[in-house]
């Protein structure tokens, strides 16, 4: 069939003009196309045989309608990346750099702008006489960060910037001592990003920075930089790898002297930094940040000396625990960030330490005490220029309520028999007879044995089976059906209470739980109990690799996973982990250092937590665990001072100290409550409530005291108290200081305790309380009298 021709082909008329362009003919065959192309080229050639290309096709609008369509089609170019946000200079066009007026990277007049530096105000006459290329500009925090910073975080960023830039004095270092959960990491990310991008001179202040942290937190720092900066900056995280690869990578980082590096921030652990310090100390670094900086309290260790050799004047030290009780440690931390502030070690002793310690002696004169007070005030006033500390009272504005409970659990009959037999043994008697270094070491081992026995007899079964000193005749104490590899909660008061509470939580709520212990052997028992009750769980201890830790934490925090328990070794993961997937935490055994326990217990009440939190500290009634708790309380009450010269509560024991530790207080509800000599309680029953301005950060004497399960803020604990019959006493309080709570009900004032019959009951809190901020200066802390 013959193909019909188009009208233009039938007419044979084509317009040939240099000013007009006609659409090509429909393709017939290759020969016809070549002929047509030659015709077009010949029509465009001039006398010099130069081709004049036609103008590009343009849309011609002949009516209002056509103009409207043209506006729609002529839309502005859009970057084809989802949720793309330009970092800076988004309105700039390509081309030759134009001479423009120097201006800040971000608008200082914008809403919610955080201005860290304001240049001097010049008159128009002064501005004309100055060199335009040297005019200073505002330093403004990137809006992507300033819009998410809370008021206390904005204050912290401003404080650190002024310190590292020397605006607050003749120094360039600072200590960020905020308590856990206040966002120290976000504040440091903001400071680092600002210094890498801005300065009053319209150029970066620094080109590189190093963040040194425990190995378990290196990955967390990388996630925080990515999270808050939305991937605008790449960090170099040193996680494992061979020695050759690590050396090559660090050498490339050290030798990179460009103003803008591809990876300007190095994330490295303390151990790796110490091993490769000879590489990193070759060149200058803009700033170093030391996370968990209390590791640097000893100026004689190799890590401290390696970091001191780093060529940088800007040093930031982060520590969520207060600087406590030792002037030498105090000097080491301050001297690291600002080496010249307190002089040399001998200068510090001569000017401050000797006078302060002399005034603390029991036989000191009034003049020596007065001079000690003067020197203390002088020292605090000097170092406060570079130290900022805020308590987690601030979090009460942003986080759900937190309930803290110290639960005294009675020893079982088996535990009590083993405990008393060991105290009466020749092993303990010899330890108390003399206080030489050798016997002190033996006493420390005996203390550890008693602490493990308070957890569960399984932890000392090997000593019992081997008939070691102190357990020669203890084999008969264990029940006939005893199996060491099959955990029996009924042999331990604390384990029995834990078993009942976990069952109640699992049956009546969707809460997740964190279990923390100082001993991996206790974690083994947790695992056996979880398998016995068919609870899903994850475990993190020192044997887990750094990469796997991050995956385990992410899995547990995922609401979609049915992971009920997170078992944590306080030595391996007590610092820096964010476990907001859980809202209940059990601290199964106390540590000598209260800072270690506080770090571990701060894993759940953090930014991102959506549910009320319950913190349980379990101690065995009348045992050595209560003695440790009392020493913790005494040490915490001294935390506002820097005067106590005790290095470690576990290393300097007098004979009287040891006798007190090895004394078992039988038939008491709580030895700690007895030593408080509480005037609000009569015969262990509370008659008066605590002060209205108290909260869970106050001294234990200002907490609620309960000798029965009535008046407890947690119905889970109340039910477990009745079911297990092993709880003797409870101290409890909440995070909001002015919250109205019921006093513990006496026998004469009965009220029915609500039973656990729904998931809503399990999280019973007063959600409508209008809590105000707590004033930390209004608390009147008291010392324990022991």
From Swiss-Prot:
One of its GO terms (cellular component) is nucleus. It is found in: Nucleus. Residues 165-340 form the Helicase ATP-binding domain. Keywords: ATP-binding, Cell cycle, Cell division, DNA damage, DNA repair, DNA-binding, Helicase, Hydrolase, Meiosis, Mitosis, Nucleotide-binding, Nucleus, Phosphoprotein. CDD domains: SF2_C_SNF (cd18793). The keyword Amino-acid biosynthesis does not apply. Residues 740-786 are annotated as: Disordered. Residues 497-654 form the Helicase C-terminal domain. It holds the Pfam family Rad54_N. The modification Phosphothreonine is found at residue 22. InterPro entries: Helicase_ATP-bd (IPR014001), Helicase_C-like (IPR001650), P-loop_NTPase (IPR027417), Rad54_N (IPR013967), SNF2-like_sf (IPR038718), SNF2/RAD54-like_C (IPR049730), SNF2_N (IPR000330), SNF2_RAD54_helicase_repair (IPR050496). The keyword RNA-binding does not apply. A motif (DEGH box) lies at residues 291-294. GO terms for biological process: cell division; chromatin remodeling; DNA synthesis involved in double-strand break repair via homologous recombination; double-strand break repair via homologous recombination; double-strand break repair via synthesis-dependent strand annealing; meiotic DNA repair synthesis; oocyte fate determination; oogenesis. GO terms for molecular function: ATP binding; ATP hydrolysis activity; ATP-dependent chromatin remodeler activity; DNA binding; DNA translocase activity; helicase activity. Its EC number is 3.6.4.-. ATP binds at residues 178-185. Residues 2-9 are annotated as: Required for chromatin remodeling, strand pairing activities and coupling of ATPase activity. It is an enzyme of class 3 (hydrolase). SMART domains: DEXDc, HELICc. Residues 752-766 have a biased composition (Polar residues). Interacts (via N-terminus) with spn-A/Rad51. Involved in mitotic DNA repair and meiotic recombination. Functions in the recombinational DNA repair pathway. Essential for interhomolog gene conversion (GC), but may have a less important role in intersister GC than spn-A/Rad51. In the presence of DNA, spn-A/Rad51 enhances the ATPase activity of okr/Rad54. Belongs to the SNF2/RAD54 helicase family. This is DNA repair and recombination protein RAD54-like. It comes from Drosophila virilis.
């Amino acid at each position: 069939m013959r193909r019909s021709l188009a009208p233009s082909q039938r007419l044979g008329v084509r317009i040939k003009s240099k000013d007009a362009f006609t659409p090509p003919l429909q393709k017939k065959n290759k020969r016809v196309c070549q002929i047509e192309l030659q015709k077009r080229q010949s029509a465009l050639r001039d006398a010099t045989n130069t081709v004049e290309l036609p103008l590009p096709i343009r849309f011609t609008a002949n009516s209002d309608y056509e103009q409207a369509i043209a506006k729609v089609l002529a839309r502005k170019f859009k970057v084809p990346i989802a949720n793309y946000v330009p970092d800076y200079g988004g309105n700039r066009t390509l081309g030759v750099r134009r001479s423009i007026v120097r201006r800040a990277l971000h608008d200082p007049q914008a809403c919610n702008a955080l201005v860290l530096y304001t240049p001097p105000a010049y008159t128009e006459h002064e501005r004309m006489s100055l060199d335009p290329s040297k005019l200073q500009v505002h330093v403004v925090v990137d809006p992507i960060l300033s819009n998410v910073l809370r008021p206390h975080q904005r204050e912290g960023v401003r404080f650190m910037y002024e310190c590292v830039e020397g605006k607050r004095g003749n120094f360039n270092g600072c200590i960020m001592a905020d308590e856990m959960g206040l966002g120290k990491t976000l504040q440091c990310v903001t400071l680092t990003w600002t210094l890498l991008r801005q300065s009053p001179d319209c150029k970066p202040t620094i080109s590189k920075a190093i963040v040194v942290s425990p190995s378990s937190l290196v990955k967390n720092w990388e996630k925080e930089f990515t999270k808050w900066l939305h991937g605008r900056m790449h960090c170099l995280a040193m996680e494992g790898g061979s020695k050759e690869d690590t050396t090559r990578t660090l050498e490339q980082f050290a030798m990179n002297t460009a103003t803008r590096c591809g990876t300007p921030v190095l994330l490295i652990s303390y151990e790796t930094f110490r091993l490769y310090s000879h590489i990193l100390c070759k060149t200058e670094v803009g700033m170093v940040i030391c996370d968990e900086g209390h590791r640097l309290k000893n100026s004689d260790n190799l890590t401290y000396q390696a970091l001191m050799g780093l060529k940088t004047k800007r040093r930031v030290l982060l520590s969520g625990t207060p600087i406590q009780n030792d002037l030498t440690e105090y000097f080491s931390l301050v001297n690291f960030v600002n080496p010249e502030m307190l002089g040399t070690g001998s200068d510090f002793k001569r000017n401050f330490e000797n006078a302060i310690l002399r005034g603390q002696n029991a036989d000191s004169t009034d003049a020596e005490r007065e001079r000690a007070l003067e020197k203390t005030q002088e020292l605090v006033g000097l170092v406060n220029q570079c130290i900022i500390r805020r308590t987690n009272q601030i979090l009460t504005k942003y986080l759900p309520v937190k309930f803290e409970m110290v639960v005294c659990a009675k020893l079982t009959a088996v535990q009590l028999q083993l405990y008393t037999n060991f105290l009466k043994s020749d092993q303990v008697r010899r330890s108390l007879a003399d206080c030489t270094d050798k016997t002190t070491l033996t006493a420390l081992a005996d203390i550890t044995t008693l602490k493990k026995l308070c957890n569960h007899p399984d932890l000392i079964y090997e000593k019992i089976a081997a008939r070691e000193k102190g357990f020669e005749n203890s084999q008969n104490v264990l029940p006939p059906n005893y199996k060491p590899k099959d955990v029996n909660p009924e042999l331990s008061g604390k384990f029995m209470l834990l078993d009942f509470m976990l069952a109640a939580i699992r049956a009546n709520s969707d809460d997740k739980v964190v279990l923390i212990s100082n001993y991996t052997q206790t974690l083994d028992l947790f695992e056996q109990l979880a398998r016995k009750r068919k609870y899903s769980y994850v475990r993190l201890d020192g044997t887990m690799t750094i990469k796997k830790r991050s995956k385990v934490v992410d899995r547990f925090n995922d609401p979609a996973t049915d992971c009920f328990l997170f078992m944590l070794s306080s030595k391996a993961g007590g610092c820096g982990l964010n476990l907001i997937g859980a809202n209940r935490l059990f601290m199964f055994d106390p540590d000598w250092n209260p800072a270690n326990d506080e770090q571990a217990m701060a894993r759940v009440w953090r930014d991102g937590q959506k549910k009320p939190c319950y913190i349980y500290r379990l101690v065995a009634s009348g045992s050595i665990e209560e003695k440790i708790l009392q020493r913790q309380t005494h040490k915490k009450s001294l935390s506002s001072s820097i005067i106590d010269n005790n290095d470690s509560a576990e290393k300097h024991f007098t004979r009287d100290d040891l006798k007190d530790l090895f004394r078992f207080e039988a038939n008491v509800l709580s030895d700690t409550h007895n030593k408080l000599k509480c005037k609000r309680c009569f015969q262990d029953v509370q008659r008066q409530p605590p002060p209205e301005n108290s909260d869970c950060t106050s001294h234990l004497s200002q907490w609620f005291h309960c000798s029965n399960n009535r008046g407890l803020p947690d119905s889970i604990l109340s039910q477990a108290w009745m079911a297990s019959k092993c709880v003797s006493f409870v101290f409890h309080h909440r995070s909001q200081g002015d919250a109205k709570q019921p006093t513990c009900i006496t026998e004469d004032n009965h009220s029915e305790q609500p039973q656990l019959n729904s998931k809503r009951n399990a999280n019973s809190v007063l959600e409508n309380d209008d809590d105000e901020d707590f004033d930390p200066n209004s608390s009147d802390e008291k010392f324990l009298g022991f």
